[in-house]
């Protein structure tokens, strides 16, 4: 604030002396000499103005006003006196009076520069920014070379956000006075605000070069270097500032922040403590000290520091947010939410708090509200990469894959070194089947952040999917060690429960992984504060019927529906009332239509996204037994089961493992799949089906495969049943229309050990190689879709989608006679064809080695695999060549529509099951095609399903107890053709006569198990193992 001291004329030099003393700050001496002069010249207004200014500087406002008033009395037109009086009013907070006096001074003296400067300051204090700008502009109109005033105008424009105008002011000030360090520093601030970091650094460095003692410029330089993450130079700038002002607490705090970013946590902690020592009421320093303590693992002390910061400043938003983070990590979700909301109440534009709150809301299943807060975070901070990445996670959970992809991509554009975003993007690629892209993104994430368990374990799974076994053993060891450490520290393991079966983990680890995911569901439902449901103790309200609820996201075109779609309609309506709860929208397929039509009640819970309300609906339906068909597969909503809307809850069919969850009572399984001696692997009680827990609806979906005919393909005197095969509903009528059809009897053993096979021969229709057979073969060779023979439509087995797409998907039964040949798939006519139609991730190095050993022992044999995925093919071929197999010994085919997939299984001689994780649905598919399957049960549920299927089928001779026995069984089938024919005949016969595909008998056995569960519960008992199943027959 400029005081006007006037001009004092005194021949004695007394006035000149008083002026020098005033300028030097020696106000006491200046006042003494002014008073002496005033007594000599009472009418000297210059002396009065100087006295007014002296008293103002000494904060003696009343005396200052007194002398200004005396000067005005002496000269009412004295502008300087009015300006000095305005200064007094401004200092007292009487802004309007101050402004009026400044304006009066300017009316008296329009070129009064100090008057404009003082008026500008008062207008700023009064909030009239535009008026202040005009005051500075007026001053500069009278003297354009006032570089300090122009710099002050620049500061005001900068504060108003008018950065370009501010920049012009600073540049003009520098042009006027190139060595004006303040303008260089202020210009650096503008460039920093505009994101021009390097220009900002340049201008701050120029400022300190011009003025090596310019404290603020060193602080600004340190700040911008810190933001640019040029930490060594930032440290140097802050240390220089501290050499100028050793007790500057804020600089100590900023320097500590740089040490923290450099990972020098102990040094950061010491420096924060020094800042607090210098300024005990420094909430920012307490908050940042807490951050460093938390990083070091001193969580309790960190929590104390956050609380201290909040005691000093209850509205300290950063401390509220960071304390909320601690509460969240401690599992105190409600307190975390309260603190996040408080932080936003204090500071609504707090982007990080919006993002953190959104993350917790997402964890609670409140996805729409989470999405809203992520959008707010991004609105406030458009370059908030974390918010984009986390919003992508929410959109992914909401099944908006494209939206998630865009979010992750934007996060990476903002911050190319953002490892989490690369990992999240990889997961989108992985879920979309773009495995090479996923692998590349996971590897980028790990380069950026080598200690990144989620990225490592997901990369391991991707490499498993494409059979990339580089450093396989080391990878498995590291993966196991990661899981061990995470379980020890009570963290959510990076291996998903559904993938745990693929790795050499202990049973305890697999169960613990599932348990952690089950606990996540409990965390989500705890926030709902729903009181426990009251459950029925009897069947009175349901007219004596047991109400069973099947919950699945797979009621549609999905392998689970292919297996069980007939069961809801086969329940005894007198004893059971069936509810099907869909977790996914209608996909428009006949699979969905069938379940909807045949269940007593079909409820689409995908339209009730709130888990609490969905569970209420299930409870209102009075369900007695609620069946979980998803486990931890895609689309699951285990939170519904965590709320326990039914008294009995059971796992069944859709998930090959334990839930690890206390809210699941039973797992429906069988003695072969889950032997009683390994019951500790399961959190649930074992509930045994009498034969196998697995079932397939193949007899209903593919009845045209119950019979087949072959075209006479002779080699070495044998008639082969799988070179050129015809199937169809009207097959018998078609064969009756043909001349010379032969019936060849194929001997096969029965389901037991009966050596007399004469009574179990199967009749195989054989069409001789005549003009009709040649027409069929020509259709195949020429790639025709369909021909007509004797009024029957004969179709190319590769063209089912072109003839009837619903038949191709298995939704309808094909109405034509379908021809399937080895030549269609490039399979050798005269070779033994081993097959496996599983996804390639189920093959591990030891499995491929067994396959290679078998092929080497069986001359003229091949292994038929699927491009599932296609990118796995070159890896398998390369490893096979390394094992000594020529490339032509392994043949790949594309994945086919469901009906073709099942039907073409007839062309193989033997299926080699994958011991790591069996073919479950694919096992049923290949057995329905009549092809024997060799398996070797392991220790996990997923590795024992095929043995269960074969046991039910009565084909124990195909179950190996060791790798050597597995190879020997496969080799015998490939070298002893008579034995192969017998086993193929047995499988062909047993698939019809055994319980394996008998859905009606299976449903009755399942009902018996449900009644056991209910009777046990109704008697007041807790769930217990049910390992002595009651067998029923179809006539029962």
Swiss-Prot record:
> Per UniProt, what does mutating residue 1000 to A do?
No effect on phosphatidylinisitol binding
* Activity's dependence on pH: Optimum pH is 6.0.
Please list the residues annotated as glycosylated. Answer: 3-4, 389
Instruction: List the pathway annotation.
Output: Protein modification; protein glycosylation
> Where is this protein chiefly located?
cytoplasm
Q: Where is this region: Required for phosphatidylinositol 3,4,5-triphosphate binding?
A: 981-1000
Motif placement: DFP motif: 454-456
* UniProt keyword annotations, A-Z: Acetylation, Biological rhythms, Cell membrane, Cell projection, Chromatin regulator, Cytoplasm, Glycoprotein, Glycosyltransferase, Lipid-binding, Membrane, Mitochondrion, Nucleus, Phosphoprotein, Repeat, TPR repeat, Transferase, Ubl conjugation
Where are the annotated TPR repeats, by residue? 11-44, 79-112, 113-146, 147-180, 181-214, 215-248, 249-282, 283-316, 317-350, 351-384, 385-418, 419-452, 453-463
User: What Pfam families does the database record attribute to this sequence?
Assistant: Glyco_transf_41, TPR_1, TPR_11, TPR_12, TPR_8
Q: How is it modified after translation?
A: Several different immunologically-related forms of this protein are found in different tissues (with apparent molecular weights of 110, 80 and 78 kDa); they are probably the result of alternative splicing and/or proteolysis. O-glycosylated; contains O-GlcNAc. Both p110 and p78 forms are O-glycosylated.
Tell me which residues bind UDP.
839, 842, 896-898, 901-904, 920-922, 925
Positions carrying Phosphoserine are 3-4
Summarize what activates or inhibits it: Inhibited by UDP, UTP and UDP-GlcNAc; 50 mM NaCl or KCl inhibit activity about 70%.
Instruction: Give all Phosphothreonine modified positions.
Output: 444
Q: Which GO terms describe its cellular component?
A: cell projection; cerebellar granule cell to Purkinje cell synapse; cytosol; euchromatin; GABA-ergic synapse; glutamatergic synapse; histone acetyltransferase complex; mitochondrial membrane
Q: What is its EC number?
A: 2.4.1.255
What are the catalytic residues? 498
- So where does this one cross the membrane? none
InterPro entries on file: OGT (IPR037919), OGT/SEC/SPY_C (IPR029489), TPR-like_helical_dom_sf (IPR011990), TPR_rpt (IPR019734)
Reactions that this protein is recorded to catalyse: L-seryl-[protein] + UDP-N-acetyl-alpha-D-glucosamine = 3-O-(N-acetyl-beta-D-glucosaminyl)-L-seryl-[protein] + UDP + H(+); L-threonyl-[protein] + UDP-N-acetyl-alpha-D-glucosamine = 3-O-(N-acetyl-beta-D-glucosaminyl)-L-threonyl-[protein] + UDP + H(+)
Which protein family is it in? Belongs to the glycosyltransferase 41 family. O-GlcNAc transferase subfamily.
Per UniProt, subunit arrangement is: Monomer; may exist in different oligomerization states in cells. Homotrimer, oligomerizes via TPR repeats 6 and 7. Trimerization is not necessary for activity in vitro, however it increases affinity for UDP-GlcNAc. A heterotrimer consisting of two 110 kDa subunits and one highly related 78 kDa subunit is isolated from liver. Component of a THAP1/THAP3-HCFC1-OGT complex. Component of the NSL complex at least composed of MOF/KAT8, KANSL1, KANSL2, KANSL3, MCRS1, PHF20, OGT1/OGT, WDR5 and HCFC1. Found in a complex with KIF5B, RHOT1, RHOT2 and TRAK1.
About its domains, the entry says: The TPR repeat domain is required for substrate binding and oligomerization.
Relate the protein's function as given in its record.
Catalyzes the transfer of a single N-acetylglucosamine from UDP-GlcNAc to a serine or threonine residue in cytoplasmic and nuclear proteins resulting in their modification with a beta-linked N-acetylglucosamine (O-GlcNAc). Glycosylates a large and diverse number of proteins including histone H2B, AKT1, AMPK, ATG4B, CAPRIN1, EZH2, FNIP1, GSDMD, KRT7, LMNA, LMNB1, LMNB2, RPTOR, HOXA1, PFKL, KMT2E/MLL5, MAPT/TAU, TET2, RBL2, RET, NOD2 and HCFC1. Can regulate their cellular processes via cross-talk between glycosylation and phosphorylation or by affecting proteolytic processing.
Q: What is this protein called?
A: UDP-N-acetylglucosamine--peptide N-acetylglucosaminyltransferase 110 kDa subunit
Q: Which organism is it from?
A: Rattus norvegicus (Rat)
């Amino acid at each position: 604030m400029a005081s006007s001291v006037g001009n004092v004329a005194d021949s004695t030099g007394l006035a000149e002396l008083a002026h020098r003393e005033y300028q030097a700050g020696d106000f006491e001496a200046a006042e003494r000499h002014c008073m002496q002069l005033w007594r000599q010249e009472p009418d000297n207004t210059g002396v009065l103005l100087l006295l007014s200014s002296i008293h103002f500087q000494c904060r003696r406002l009343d005396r200052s006003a007194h002398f200004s008033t005396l000067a005005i009395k002496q000269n009412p037109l004295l502008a300087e006196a009015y300006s000095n009086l305005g200064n007094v009013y401004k200092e007292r907070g009487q802004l309007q009076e101050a402004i009026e006096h400044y304006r009066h001074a300017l009316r008296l003296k329009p070129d009064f520069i100090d008057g404009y400067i003082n008026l500008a300051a008062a207008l700023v204090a009064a909030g009239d920014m535009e008026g202040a700008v005009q005051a500075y502009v007026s001053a500069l109109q009278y003297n354009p070379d006032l570089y300090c005033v122009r710099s002050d105008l620049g500061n005001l424009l900068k504060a108003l956000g008018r950065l370009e105008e501010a920049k012009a002011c600073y540049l003009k000030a520098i042009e006027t006075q190139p060595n004006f360090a303040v303008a260089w520093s202020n210009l650096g601030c503008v460039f920093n605000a505009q994101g021009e970091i390097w220009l900002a650094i340049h201008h701050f460095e120029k400022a300190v070069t011009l003025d090596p003692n310019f404290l603020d410029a060193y602080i600004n330089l340190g700040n911008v270097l810190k933001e640019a993450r040029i930490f060594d130079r930032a440290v140097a700038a802050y240390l220089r500032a501290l050499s100028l002002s050793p007790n500057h607490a804020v600089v100590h705090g900023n320097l500590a922040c740089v040490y923290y970013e450099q990972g020098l946590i102990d040094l950061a902690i010491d420096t924060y403590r020094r800042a607090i020592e210098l300024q005990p009421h420094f909430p920012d320093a307490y908050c940042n000290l807490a951050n460093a303590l938390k990083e070091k693992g001193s969580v309790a002390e960190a929590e104390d520091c956050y609380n201290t910061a909040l005691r000093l400043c209850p509205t300290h938003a950063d401390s509220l947010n960071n304390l909320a983070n601690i509460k969240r990590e401690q599992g105190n979700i409600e307190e975390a939410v309260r603190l996040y909301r408080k932080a936003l109440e204090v500071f609504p534009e707090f982007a990080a708090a919006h993002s953190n709150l959104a993350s917790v809301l997402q964890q609670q299943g409140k996805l729409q509200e989470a999405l809203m807060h992520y959008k707010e975070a991004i609105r406030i901070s458009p370059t908030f990469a974390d918010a984009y990445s986390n919003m992508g996670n929410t959109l992914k959970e909401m099944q908006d894959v494209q939206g998630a992809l865009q979010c992750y991509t934007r996060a990476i554009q903002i911050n190319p070194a953002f490892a989490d975003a690369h990992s999240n993007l990889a997961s989108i690629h992985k879920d979309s089947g773009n495995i090479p892209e996923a692998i590349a993104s996971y590897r980028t994430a790990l380069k950026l952040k080598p200690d990144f368990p989620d990225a490592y374990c997901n990369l391991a799974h991707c490499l498993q999917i494409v059979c990339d076994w580089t450093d396989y053993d080391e990878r498995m060891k590291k993966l196991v060690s990661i899981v061990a450490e995470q379980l020890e520290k009570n963290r959510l393991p990076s291996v998903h429960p559904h993938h745990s079966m693929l790795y050499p983990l202990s049973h305890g680890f697999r169960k613990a992984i599932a348990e952690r995911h089950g606990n996540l569901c409990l965390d989500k439902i705890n926030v709902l504060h729903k009181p426990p449901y009251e459950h029925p103790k009897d069947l009175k309200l349901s007219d004596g019927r047991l109400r069973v609820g099947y919950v699945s996201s797979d009621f549609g075109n999905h392998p689970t529906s292919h297996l069980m779609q007939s069961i809801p309609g086969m329940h005894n309506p007198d004893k059971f009332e069936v509810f099907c709860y869909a977790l996914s929208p209608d996909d428009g397929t006949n699979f969905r239509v069938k379940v909807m039509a045949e269940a007593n009640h079909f409820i689409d819970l995908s339209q009730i996204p709130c888990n609490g309300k969905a569970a209420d609906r299930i409870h209102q339906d009075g369900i007695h037994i609620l069946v979980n068909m998803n486990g931890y597969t895609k689309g699951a909503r285990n939170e519904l089961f965590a709320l326990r809307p039914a008294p009995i809850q059971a796992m069944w069919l859709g998930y090959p493992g334990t839930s690890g969850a206390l809210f699941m009572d039973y797992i429906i399984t069988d003695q072969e799949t889950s032997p009683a001696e390994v019951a500790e692997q399961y959190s649930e009680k074992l509930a045994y089906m009498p034969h196998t827990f697995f079932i397939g609806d193949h007899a209903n979906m593919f009845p045209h495969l119950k019979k087949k005919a072959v075209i006479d393909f002779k080699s070495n005197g044998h008639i082969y049943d799988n070179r050129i095969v015809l199937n169809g509903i009207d097959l018998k009528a078609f064969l009756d229309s043909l001349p010379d059809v032969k019936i060849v009897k194929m001997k096969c053993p029965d389901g037991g050990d009966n050596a007399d096979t004469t009574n179990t021969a199967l009749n195989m229709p054989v069409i001789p190689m005549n003009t009709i057979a040649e027409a069929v073969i020509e259709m195949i060779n020429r790639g025709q879709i369909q021909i007509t023979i004797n009024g029957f439509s004969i179709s190319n087995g590769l063209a089912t989608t072109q003839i009837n797409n619903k038949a191709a998907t298995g939704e309808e039964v094909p109405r034509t006679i379908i021809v399937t040949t080895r030549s269609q798939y490039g399979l050798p006519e005269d070779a033994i064809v081993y097959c496996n139609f599983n996804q390639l991730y189920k093959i591990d190095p030891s499995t491929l080695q067994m396959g290679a050993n078998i092929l080497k022992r069986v001359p003229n044999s091949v292994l038929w695999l699927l491009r599932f995925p296609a990118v796995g093919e070159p890896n398998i071929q390369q490893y096979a060549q390394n094992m000594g197999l020529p490339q032509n010994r392994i043949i790949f085919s594309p994945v086919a529509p469901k009906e073709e997939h099942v039907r073409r299984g007839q062309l193989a001689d033997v299926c080699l099951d994958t011991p790591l994780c069996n073919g479950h649905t694919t096992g049923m598919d290949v057995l329905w095609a009549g092809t024997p399957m060799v398996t070797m049960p392991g220790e996990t549920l997923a590795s024992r399903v095929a043995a269960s299927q074969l046991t039910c089928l009565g084909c124990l001779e195909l179950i190996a107890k060791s790798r050597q026995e597995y190879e020997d069984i496969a080799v015998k089938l490939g070298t002893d053709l008579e034995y192969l024919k017998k086993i193929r005949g047995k499988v062909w016969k047993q698939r019809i006569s055994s319980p394996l595909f008998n859905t009606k008998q299976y449903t009755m056995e399942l009902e018996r198990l449900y009644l056991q569960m209910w009777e046990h519960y109704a008697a007041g008992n807790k769930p217990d193992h049910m390992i002595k199943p009651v067998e029923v027959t179809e006539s029962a």
